[in-house]
């Protein structure tokens, strides 16, 4: 009676020990460093805080009053840089 291809494939794999197949393989990817995530979140929160403070108390804070419409650019730039950093997060 002819042997099936399935059985012959199992015989090839059975020659290696089962312990070799169970050992975990360490990946080379180390992930994102902690400082990167902290910086990313800090930039997003700082941008949000800048916009909220500008909206609530902007005219009462001297340097924010002098910046005028640039406050929106600063706040949104901080938010966008933080959001762009999320693309590098692993």
UniProtKB/Swiss-Prot annotation:
Pfam family, one: CrgA
One GO term (biological process): cell division
Keyword Cell cycle among UniProt keywords: yes
Keyword Membrane: yes
A GO cellular-component term linked to this record: plasma membrane
InterPro entries reported for this sequence: CrgA (IPR009619)
Membrane topology type: Multi-pass membrane protein
Region ranges (Disordered): 1-27
Role: Involved in cell division.
Official protein name in the record: Cell division protein CrgA
